[in-house]
Amino acid sequence: MTPIDAKRPLQLNDQGQLRHFLSLDGLPRELLTEILDTADSFLEVGARAVKKVPLLRGKTVCNVFFENSTRTRTTFELAAQRLSADVISLNVSTSSTSKGETLFDTLRNLEAMAADMFVVRHSDSGAAHFIAEHVCPDVAVINGGDGRHAHPTQGMLDMLTIRRHKGSFENLSVAIVGDILHSRVARSDMLALKALGCPDIRVIGPKTLIPIGIEQYGVKVYTDLAEGLKDVDVVIMLRLQRERMAGGLLPSEGEFYRLFGLTTARLACAKPDAIVMHPGPINRGVEIESAVADGKHSVILNQVTYGIAVRMAVLSMAMSGQNAQRQFDQENAQ
C-alpha cells in the first residue's frame, strides 16, 4: 500500500479537482456548487427508459459498509450502476472483519482486487480518512458516513433538496432539530450551509444533545422548539441515535417527542411554505408525527431521489479527478 503524498491536499488533486470525498470541511463553495450542478444534470437520467450513462464503464466501485444502511448503500449502488460501473458490495457480517481481521488488512485485500473506488461506511470517526491516506494513489475513496464525524454525500443531497425547492441559500433560515450531538449529518449540513452562504443556521434540541462549542460552526443554539422554528424556511429533523448514546442523556423517547417532536401545530411556527426534511430512517412518534412526515411540507422522498443524482456526481467527479492527477503525475515524471 502506498501512502498519499503528504504535500498534496487529501481530498483534491493538484488542479483543485475532487479525488476523494471525505468531508465537507474546507471544500470551497465553487466545488460544492459544481457538485450540485452536476447532480442536477444527472436527475434526468432517472427518468429515462434506460437509466445509464457510460462515464464509469470499465471501472469497479467497491461498497465497503461496516455499518448497516438501506438508503445510503442502495443509492450508492444505483448511482454506480447508472454510471455503468461494476459494483461489488462487501457483506461485513460475513466478512473476515467479523473474524478479527483489521481494517488495514481488509483494505489490503480489497486493493488486491483492483477496485477503482471504495465507498466506505464505518462506525469509527476518521475511518474513511485512514483508508484514503493508505490506499493506492489511483484509488478514490468516498465517505459514506464515519462515526459522528461526517456524512458528506448526505450533506450534499440535503443541499440539492434545499436548492431545488428554495432556489438560493442567500436569504434562508434553516433549523436542524434533534440529536445534534451524535449526528454526522448535522455536522455535514452545517458545514455545507455555511459554505454556500446561508445566513441563518439554527440548531434545536435538549442541552444534553447539543455539543459544547457548536457555535464555532456559525450557528444559533435553541433549546425551545417553537422559538427555534420561528419563521424558518427549512426544517431538518434528525433521528435519535440510541445506539450511540450513553445512559442518562434523555429521560425517555416520549419526553423527547413532547418537547421536540415535530407536529403540525409546531410546524406552524415556521414559514407557511417551509419544507421538512429528514435523513432517515424516520422514527414516527419520536422526532416527527406521521401527518408531517407524509404531509404537503415534506420533501423526504425527494431527498432519496436526489441522493442518487448527488452520488452519481461525486463518483464521476472523483474518478475524473483521479484520472487527471494520474495524467499530471505521468507528464511531470517524463
Swiss-Prot record:
Broadest EC class assigned to this enzyme: transferase
Domain of life from the UniProt record: Bacteria
Binding-site positions, carbamoyl phosphate: R71, T72, R121, H151, Q154, G280, P281
Q: Which Gene Ontology terms cover its molecular function?
A: amino acid binding; aspartate carbamoyltransferase activity
**Pathway membership:** Pyrimidine metabolism; UMP biosynthesis via de novo pathway; (S)-dihydroorotate from bicarbonate: step 2/3
Q: Name one GO biological process term.
A: 'de novo' UMP biosynthetic process
The reaction(s) this protein catalyses: carbamoyl phosphate + L-aspartate = N-carbamoyl-L-aspartate + phosphate + H(+)
E.C. number: 2.1.3.2
Q: Which UniProt keywords apply?
A: Pyrimidine biosynthesis, Transferase
Q: Which GO terms describe its cellular component?
A: cytosol
Q: In which residues is L-aspartate bound?
A: K99, R184, R239
**Classification via Pfam families:** OTCace, OTCace_N
This protein's assembly is summarised as: Heterododecamer (2C3:3R2) of six catalytic PyrB chains organized as two trimers (C3), and six regulatory PyrI chains organized as three dimers (R2).
Q: What does this protein do?
A: Catalyzes the condensation of carbamoyl phosphate and aspartate to form carbamoyl aspartate and inorganic phosphate, the committed step in the de novo pyrimidine nucleotide biosynthesis pathway.
Family under the similarity heading: Belongs to the aspartate/ornithine carbamoyltransferase superfamily. ATCase family.
- NCBIfam families attached to this UniProt entry: asp_carb_tr, PRK00856.1
In its UniProt entry, what is this protein called?
Answer: Aspartate carbamoyltransferase catalytic subunit
Q: Which organism is it from?
A: Pseudomonas putida
